[in-house]
Design a protein with these regions (language model features):
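Active-site loop-to-helix "anion-binding N-cap" substructures in soluble metabolic enzymes
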Residues: 1-240, 247-261, 265-317
Length: 317
C-alpha cells in the first residue's frame, strides 16, 4: 500500500481496485468521463441511471466520477455514506446558470404564478431544494406529463431541454434561460457539413442541443437511450451529437459500428472541460486520502431529497 502521493511506477488501476476493496467503495462514472475512468467504474451511465445506482448501493463509500452536482445527488440520497469526487472543482456551466438565490428571488417576485418547479438534475442542491420534482433527460417527458394540470410550470435550468419537452408534450412551461456550453456549440451548419461527408449516417442528438440541431436529428434522446438507438439501428455509421466521452461507451457496447463525433463550428472536440477534470490519478488520490468529500448541511439535504425521491417514484410508474 502506498502511504501518500502517487508512485508513478505503480499500476494505478490495480491500486484503485485494492483501495476499493479496502474501503468497500463503489465507483460510479458518467458517460462523459475520460475512458480510463469509465473502464474502472462499477457502473457507467446517464444521470438517471447513476441516481438509481446511488440510491441502491450498499457500499460504504461512493467515488463519483462526474461533476459536482452529480456527486451532491449521490450524497443527498446517501446521507450516511462517504461520497468522494476526484476533483472538487469539476463544476457545470448549466448548473451555474441557475444559482439558488436567483431562483428564490424569481419565485418570490412571481409568487402569484404559484409555480410547480421542475428542475433538471443538472443543478445544485440549493436549486433542488426549491423544486417540486427533479427530472433527467431520460425521464423529463414523463415527469412533465405527470405535473398537476392546474399549475404553472417553471422548468429550470436548461432552456433547450425544456423546449424539447414542450414540443413532445404540448405542455406550456416557462423556461429558465440556461444552457450547456458544449451542446450549444453544435450548430445546424456544422451538422449539415458532417452529413455531407457521411450521407447515409443517421444523426442522434442530445435534447440539450438547440432547436436547429434537433430538427436535423433522426433521433433526440438521453445518452442512455443513445446506446439503445445505436444498437438497434441498421446503420453502420452513426453521427453522435453530444459530449465526446459518450463515444467510448458506444464503441465498447456496440462494436462493429463507426461512431462519428458531431462537430462544432470550431472542431471535432466537443469535450466538457469540467467532466475531463477528473483523472485516474485524482480518483486514486481520492480513495487513498478519502477526500475531497461532498458535505451538505442536513436541512438542505432533506429539502433536496424530497423532489429526487419524487422523480424516482414517478419514473417507476
Amino acid at each position: 500500500m502506498v502511504a501518500a502521493g502517487v508512485n508513478f511506477g505503480l499500476d494505478l488501476v490495480e491500486e484503485i481496485a485494492e483501495l476499493k476493496r479496502e474501503r468497500n467503495a463503489v465507483i460510479l462514472a458518467h458517460n462523459y468521463q475520460v475512458p480510463e475512468l469509465q473502464d474502472i467504474a462499477d457502473y457507467v451511465g446517464d444521470s438517471l441511471g447513476l441516481s438509481y445506482q446511488a440510491a441502491q448501493t450498499d457500499a460504504d463509500v461512493i467515488l463519483f466520477c462526474g461533476v459536482h452536482f452529480m456527486a451532491e445527488t449521490a450524497k443527498i440520497l446517501n446521507p450516511t455514506k462517504k461520497v468522494l469526487l476526484p476533483d472538487l472543482d469539476a463544476g457545470c456551466s448549466l448548473s451555474e446558470s441557475c444559482p439558488p438565490e436567483k431562483l428564490k428571488a424569481f419565485l418570490d417576485a412571481h409568487a402569484e404564478k404559484n409555480y410547480y418547479v421542475i428542475a433538471y438534475i443538472n443543478c445544485s442542491a440549493g436549486v433542488k431544494a426549491l423544486s417540486d420534482v427533479i427530472c433527467t433527460s431520460g425521464n423529463a417527458e414523463k415527469i412533465v406529463r405527470s405535473a398537476p394540470a392546474d399549475r404553472n410550470i417553471l422548468f429550470v435550468p436548461d432552456q433547450n431541454l425544456g423546449a424539447w419537452v414542450m414540443e413532445r408534450t404540448g405542455r406550456k412551461m416557462d423556461l429558465w434561460q440556461g444552457n450547456c456550453y458544449i451542446h450549444v456549440e453544435f450548430t445546424a451548419r456544422s451538422i449539415n457539413r458532417i452529413r455531407e461527408t457521411y450521407p447515409n449516417a443517421p444523426v442522434v442528438a442530445h435534447p440539450e442541443c438547440t432547436y436547429a440541431v434537433r430538427l436535423l436529428a433522426d433521433e433526440v434522446c438521453s445518452t442512455e437511450k443513445m446506446v439503445t438507438f445505436c444498437r438497434n439501428s441498421p446503420a453502420r455509421e452513426i453521427i453522435v451529437v453530444t459530449e465526446a466521452g459518450m463515444l467510448h461507451r458506444l464503441k465498447k457496447e456496440v462494436p462493429g459500428k463507426l461512431f462519428i463525433p458531431g462537430p462544432t463550428e470550431n472542431c471535432f472536440c466537443g469535450e466538457c472541460r469540467f467532466m475531463k477534470m477528473n483523472t485516474l490519478e485524482k480518483a486514486h488520490a481520492a480513495l487513498l486520502n478519502m477526500s475531497p468529500e461532498i458535505v451538505l448541511p442536513e436541512a438542505l439535504r432533506k429539502r433536496a431529497e424530497a423532489p429526487i425521491l419524487r422523480m424516482l417514484e414517478l419514473s417507476k410508474s
